Amino acid sequence: MIAQHGCYHQYTTRKGGLFPLNCFSEYAGVPLEQQRSMISCGKKKLEERGIYTDIFMAPGHTFDKNTLKALKECGFSFLTDGFGKKPYCREGLTFLPVSSRKKDCFRGKQGYTTLVIHANGMNASEIGWYERMLAEYPEKFISYKEFMEIPGEKRGFAGNLAEYLQASAKRILVKLIGLRHGNGGNGR
């Protein structure tokens, strides 16, 4: 499965939007018409290469209501983002939640999430860790196709608020830990 990951992957605003894991975005804070144009442009670029998808993942994990509206208008059904233990529905899209911590994917917790891996910034030791986890816990993984077949639950205001607060708290903790470790608080 391939998800469209933005259009240019350039952060043009300092907004966190509805899921503020970061305070920078390609989409959050951008007018609807511009978002629709960028999402459509990215989709066209993929389709010109024979790649058809209705899955989207926002760069920086940041998006707003305009993003969700533009995604629907451009034919997307899924957004791989947000926090939760199983798919949920919001604004007519099915969210496939991401793990808030990679270790949570391998614990005895019930439910499903996606694990976001930025392989381009990993060293051999980190890659080895993932290889070991995949070998040791094969029962903890399902295919993306299977994940997409799990019906999304309707999520209301309380669930959306809890997710917003959790994303905000994680962003702040990552910044504090980064400051403590001397990397300027960008958590990377």
Language-model features and meaning:
Residues 1, 8-9, 13-14, 19-51, ...:
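Terminal accessory/targeting
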